[in-house]
Amino acid sequence: MLEEFNLFLLISDKSLIAYHLDVVTAGPTSTVDSSRKAPQKLSGSRDVGFFVAGRMKDRTLVFYKKRDNLSSTFKVLEPIYQKSSERKRAGYFKRGSTEFFREFDDFYIPTECTGINLFTSSLAVSTARGFEVLSLERKVPQSVPEVQGESVQNIVRHIKDQRALCMLRLSEAEFLLCYANCAVYVNKHGEISRSVIMEFVGTAQTAALSGAYLVLFDTDFIEIRNAQNGRLKQIIAGREIKCLDDGGEYNAGLNRPPVPAGNGSVYGSSAAGGRTVKAVMQHPENERTQIVVELLLNDEMKEG
């Protein structure tokens, strides 16, 4: 959801569609002008694998991956409608000759990709062979982590066949590479910064940061660890669990502001930032019902 531009994005029938929030939230007696606020198809037909949105260098951008076979082509779009605050002052949404989005850029990764994390001036792509970091200016992928050096070979062997999930920023100088069964620490140059491997209890399908904590989503439980030292803090049991909202800006885990943590600043999200992590799971008693849970930090759990 791009509240700043009064837009809601979703994938429908493998196509990326943009809707006005006024249309999505309209009540039965609403007088929304549907002709002026019709949804816009942002991609081709049935060719979108996934999309993310976030801010890079003060621009709001939307990235989507085309459904290629053994390679990945990414399209980058920029919304150009006037902001919702301007729309409210005007009292209506001026369309004029502009469109919802303009084509901003594109790039190619010669392998299958499963996710993107955006940072201030660069992005990390999760691929079938690990992580690739690049900027839109140069578009020269750098494989992360750096695997040279005898001292890191144990870690390199451990992550060799692991499925790459996401790259999360812990501080200005350190990042966490999250895989399905473990995580490793790297510095801003992509070099392994600690000799430890954070082993998970389960097999994570998704990973997110919430304040000082790493939240991991297995299909049968949610695993919560201290992001700085890897200590297990909590297990939340369930069935058919999926992450709905990772708490990051634009629901994509991107560009998180620094949040004070018990043992340093962690670039995550928290209720203080207005966003929280949310998940959906099977209702424990009613097979035909699912429940949505919101993860909130218990004050007694905070680490001093």
State what each model feature region is.
Residues 234-235:
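Extended acidic/polar alpha-helical scaffold segments
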Residues 1-194, 201-231, 240-304:
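Eukaryotic assembly scaffold/adaptor repeat-domain signature, activating on surface loops/turns
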